[in-house]
Amino acid sequence: MSSPNSDDSHLWVNWDEYHRLIERLSLQVFESGWQFDQILCLARGGVRVGDVMSRIFDVPLGILATSSYREAAGTKQGDLDIAQFITITRGSLQGRVLLVDDMVDTGKTFMKVHDHLKNQFPAITELRSAVLWWKGHSQATPDYYVDKLPMNPWIHQPFEDYDSLRPHQLEAWIRKGSR
């Protein structure tokens, strides 16, 4: 099933495109020569990005849950909630950390998380950020990004199909071959 055409208001991304973006981001970080100790991804949007990158770089993955897009069916940014704890596979958050998310939109989340990490985790010696998309109106600048979007399109990521899918709908979904 093909995606609708993208325009200034909507950017449609399929699974293959999504994974190529993660690979391009990983290559960009690698080619920068920066050596980091851990990846910290922001859940939920950065989880897939962080998972793939932690496998490529063979470094521990930490997950920090954040949430601000709850209103208007997840399309309007509200107050930011940052989880009290970080889940990490080995050790604690320290040293050189690569903060990963799917995008920097307004930049508010990135700036608040950056401040939170610096205040709560003094063992972090260097913090850099990597995203797939950097929106032009953002107040924050990521260290690494794949696409800078001068406009402010809604990015339709491939996993958004699951946002409206419920367990009782799975059988029909599978039979239909919806993807």
Segments from the language model and where they lie:
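PRPP-associated nucleotide enzymes
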Residues: 1-179
